[in-house]
Amino acid sequence: MGGNVGLSKAYNKAVESIDGRDGYICFFDDDTAVPENYFALMEKEIEKTGADILLPCVFDRNGYMSPCKISGVSVSAISSLEELNEDNISGINSGMAVKAEVFKAYRYDENYFLDFIDHKFLSDMKKQKRKIAAAKSVELKQSFSANDFSDIKAARRRFAVFKKDYSLFCRQAGGLKNKLIGALVIAKRFININFIGRLRSK
């Protein structure tokens, strides 16, 4: 594709290269540990739920990373799958299984480079009345670098990408409340990197 053009463009290129629109397409990050029985378990979850989109249970060192809850532009972790419903469910792309037919008339928003591509996608799918479900029996482990501030310079570069993508997500969501929440989230992450992260590294 010629250099790092962004994850959304890479996803679209991959989707376009797949022949046919039967079955499901599964997405994985390179920092996600995938168990050998992933596909067998996911197939059972598809049969059980009949969902268009299935989100496995992805864990990082703090607990559930995905699925998660979303309210407007505010994303928060869950402690139990019982907290989820069809309105507030969201999650990350890694491990996600999507019915191939979904992409007959959908492409990822290429204005996003790396962050919030998944939340934007799931928001769009809710508008299309697609069924989204948690694949309760499928568990993955994730090493997520966005919250690692041990390398301040790398964290600042990562923050610049996050800020651009999340600001776009907030603008597209619209409304003063969402813009204010977005500004607070960005400010909090900036402080964590430039002040708290620096103190921890000393």
Language-model-derived ranges and their functions:
Residues 11, 37-39, 117:
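Acidic donor-diphosphate engagement hotspot in glycosyltransferases and nucleotidyltransferases
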